[in-house]
Design a protein with these regions (language model features):
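Iron-associated oxidoreductase/ferritin-like identity signal
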Residues: 1-84
Length: 84
């Protein structure tokens, strides 16, 4: 389970790297390719998250609790926090 968590962290780091490079270029094709790669890494995160759910049943419970806490705090749309 720890190795899967580490792999998830690595995928998030890769996403950040590809998106940072994509944001830094004005070359439309390069930007599109880099964003596509970042999106593939996001799919990997989803695969790893599903694997964690299978290996650690408490994972889903913890995620559900976290979502509920955000909902209760009135922060249903987290992205609004970062756009203001």
């Amino acid at each position: 389970v720890r190795a899967i968590r580490d792999a998830t962290i690595a995928e998030h780091a890769a996403i950040k790297q590809y998106e940072t490079v994509a944001d830094s270029t004005n070359h439309a094709k390069a930007k599109a390719v880099l964003q596509d790669i970042a999106n593939e890494e996001k799919a990997h995160v989803g695969e790893l998250q599903k694997l964690l759910s299978l290996l650690d049943p408490q994972e889903d419970e913890s995620l559900a609790e976290g979502k509920e806490e955000v909902k209760e705090a009135g922060l249903i749309c987290i992205s609004k926090l970062f756009l203001n």
